[in-house]
Amino acid sequence: MNNSGKTSTAVSWLKQIILVILATVFISVLIIQTYDINDVSMEPTFDPHGNRVMVFLTPYIFGNLPDRGDIVIVDSRVDRERTMADRFTDSPVISVIMQQRNENLWIKRVIGLPGDHLEFINGAVHRNGEALVEDYIKESMNEGFEATVVPEGHIYVMGDNRNRSSDSRHVGPVPLSNVQGRVILRFFPFDKINAY
C-alpha cells in the first residue's frame, strides 16, 4: 500500500471515530443518559453504592408532565433558568472528560403535580386530602413540612429515604424546566435490573 492509501485510510478512521464521539455526545445530551446513584436519599429503592440507572431525557421537554410516582432526575438549582449549556455540561460523557460530578442533580420521586395540595398529617403525606400509600419509603418522616399547593409549571419531589433526603421540602417545588428526565431502567447491579 502506498503512502497515499495509508493516509486515506487513517483519515477515514479518524472521521469514523469523530462521528462516533459526536453521536455519543448527542445521545447523552438529548436522548438518554446514565447516572450513578451514590447517596442515601432514595433508599430502599436504590442502594447508594453502585446502582446505575438509565434516564430518558425527552419526555418533559415539550411541557409534558411526569406522572405521580415517577422517579426523575432534577436540577436542584430552582432559582435559575436552565440552559442548553446546562444539558451539555450535565452529560455523563462530559462529566467524565472534565472529571467532575454534578452535585446539583438529584434523583427523586414525583409526589405532587401542578395544583396538588400537599400536607403532612399524623406522620403521612396527604395529597388533595388523601393519605398516600407509600410502600416504597424507608421509614416514616421524623419532621413534617408546611402545607403547600404545587404551582403551575412545577412538580414536588421527595426522596424515598425521607429522613435523609434534600428535596422539595428544602428547595421548594421544582420548575418543569429543571426536570432532566425520567428514570426508565436500573441496569446495575445485574441482580437488581428493573424497568420503571
Q: Which ranges hold each PLM region?
A:
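Extended hydrophobic leader/signal-anchor segments used for secretion and membrane insertion
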Residues: 1-196
